[in-house]
Structure formats: structure tokens, C-alpha cells
């Protein structure tokens, strides 16, 4: 997945393909597992950001490239979508601000403009760490080549179940 430029389509529209070199060539990541319950790839590791926050990445599923300084290019698969969504959220705890991360990862839309308007200048990694919130898994609700609906699952000790689900499209 690569950011899409589809500003006229509104907040709930599906992303349009981009014509950037990143999307046309280098982001063509080989898909080996299209299951909604994929096997963990042998190259899955954890990227470390500020204050020791970590999130999963895979050299084979994504991110496989850097585009404009951002981790990009994920397999068009359920696991690729989950890793892309997690990377988009956690990138703000790496070398980019929350606004920079949102600007890169969210498709151009009314929703993007609203998100950027309320984005903090800098995210607080200590707040995330102290809450005990960590990536724990994902659930695929719907998947096609061009659109995915998923729920990222986080451990969250203060919740009634110990987990928190974040739905995304």
C-alpha cells in the first residue's frame, strides 16, 4: 500500500491508485499469503522508536522501501494491511511528528484534513508506554485488492478485557 492522492473523493471513499514511481514499481511487493489468519513470516521483527516503543515489521511483507523518508510498500494482503496500519500509527513515535505521519500515510480526503487539523505537534511516547498499550494482533473484517477493513488489537491493561480494538479502513 502507498499513500493515495484522491482529495475529491471525500472521507469515506476508497483510495485511488497513485501514479508515483513508488506505487508503480518499487512497491510491487510479492504476496505469498492472502489468508485472513496468515502465518507469521519468519522475518518478522520489531522496529524500535522513541522511549522504546516497538511495532512489528517484515522485510518480505512490509515495509520494504523508504519513500520520502517514510517506511512504505507493503504486500497487498491481510498481513500487509495490518503491518501498514500499525506502521502508520507508530511512525509518529519514530523520527516524524504526528502531523507528518498522518500527512504521508492517510489518503487525501476530507478526513485527512480534519485529522491534520487536530494532530498534536509531537506525540508523547511516555504516555503510550505508561498506559501499557502495545500491538497484540489484528482482525480482518473485509479485504479486497484495493480496500481493507481491519481492527488492530492492542494490549491495554486498564480496560475490562485487557485489550483495545481500533477499527480502520
Q: Could you say what each language-model-derived stretch is?
A:
Residues 11-13, 81-85, 148:
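Small-side-chain structural scaffolding
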Residues 97-169:
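Structured, amphipathic secondary-structure segments that form assembly/contact surfaces
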Residues 48-120:
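Core segments of small alpha/beta cavity-forming domains
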Residues 2-76:
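Juxtamembrane and targeting peptides
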Residues 5-6, 28, 91, 103, ...:
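Detector for Asparagine
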Amino acid at each position: 500500500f502507498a499513500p493515495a492522492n484522491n482529495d475529491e473523493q471525500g472521507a469515506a471513499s476508497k483510495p485511488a491508485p497513485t501514479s508515483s514511481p513508488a506505487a508503480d514499481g518499487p512497491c510491487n511487493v510479492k504476496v505469498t499469503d492472502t489468508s485472513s489468519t496468515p502465518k507469521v513470516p519468519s522475518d518478522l521483527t520489531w522496529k524500535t522508536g522513541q522511549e522504546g516503543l516497538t511495532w512489528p515489521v517484515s522485510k518480505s511483507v512490509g515495509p520494504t522501501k523508504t519513500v520520502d523518508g517514510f517506511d512504505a510498500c507493503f504486500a497487498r494482503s491481510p498481513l500487509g494491511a495490518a503491518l501498514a496500519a500499525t506502521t502508520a500509527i507508530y511512525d509518529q513515535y519514530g523520527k516524524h511528528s504526528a502531523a507528518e505521519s498522518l500527512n504521508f500515510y492517510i489518503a487525501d480526503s476530507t478526513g485527512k484534513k480534519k485529522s491534520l487539523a487536530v494532530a498534536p505537534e509531537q506525540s508523547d511516547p511516555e504516555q503510550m508506554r505508561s498506559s501499557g498499550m502495545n500491538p497484540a494482533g489484528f482482525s480482518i473484517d473485509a479485504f479486497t485488492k484495493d480496500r481493507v477493513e481491519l481492527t488492530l488489537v492492542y494490549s491495554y491493561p486498564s480496560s475490562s478485557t485487557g485489550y483495545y480494538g481500533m477499527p480502520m479502513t
